[in-house]
Amino acid sequence: HPGGVVITPDPVCNHVPVENAAKGVPLIQWEKDGAEKGGLVKIDLLGNRSLAVIRDSVAALEKKGRFTASGWEPEDDQKTKGSVSCGRTMGCFYIESPAMRLLQKKAGTGNFEQLVIQSSIIRPAANEFVPEYVRRLHGGTWEALNPGLENVLDETFGLMVYQEDVSRVAVALAGFSHSEADGLRKVLSKKDRELRLRDYRDAFYKGCREKGVECRETDRIWAMMMSFDGYSFCKPHSASYARVSFQAAYLKAHFPAEFMAAVISNR
């Protein structure tokens, strides 16, 4: 797991076997799931080349006296919103893929709040919900999946978009405790989820029955939960991605030469 870092209060070798990699980097001899089960604190530190693109663009512009990053709020910039809504985002972090550019064009909003939603709903297992999101975004009628979910998913037009939505629905509809609901969220992101998912499914269906939810509705809601299979974002993750995307889109919209030079230099 190349991006995983384990943090311990004293030397890590006191807690787990350690070996040195060929490049001299110390590695624990447990895989990531075993490390978590063993009580070690594991965080993922992944590199993001787009941060270097933004850094180099800003440095070049500040050197020329054309820009200052102090108090910079790209989310409020109309030119940036226009570029995003038209899909003119090649070179911009996370929103340059064909799928994201097409979604930007269909959405046509270009605002930060919707980009946060779009950054999460674009996940592979949720493709079927993207057209429905666009329809509802443009004023299409919709109803809550169940009366018990009114005001739970209003922000996302009644669709489950973030990992937290799975937990919130499980609490509101099936009477899960918050720890049980978070356990379901975690299981959905694991490769070996089938080993425990059956128990969560049975508990979810049982809780829904006890609250009077029809089996057909429960099936629909569970199917939407399954769209979080393996790859999905929590809202803070999606918001942080959207923030970087907007910074890149701002620089491209206002300073395309310096921005693209930084993109090429960091390939």
Task: Give the location of each predicted region.
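Noncatalytic, beta-rich nucleic-acid-contacting surfaces in large DNA/RNA-processing enzymes
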Residues: 2-267
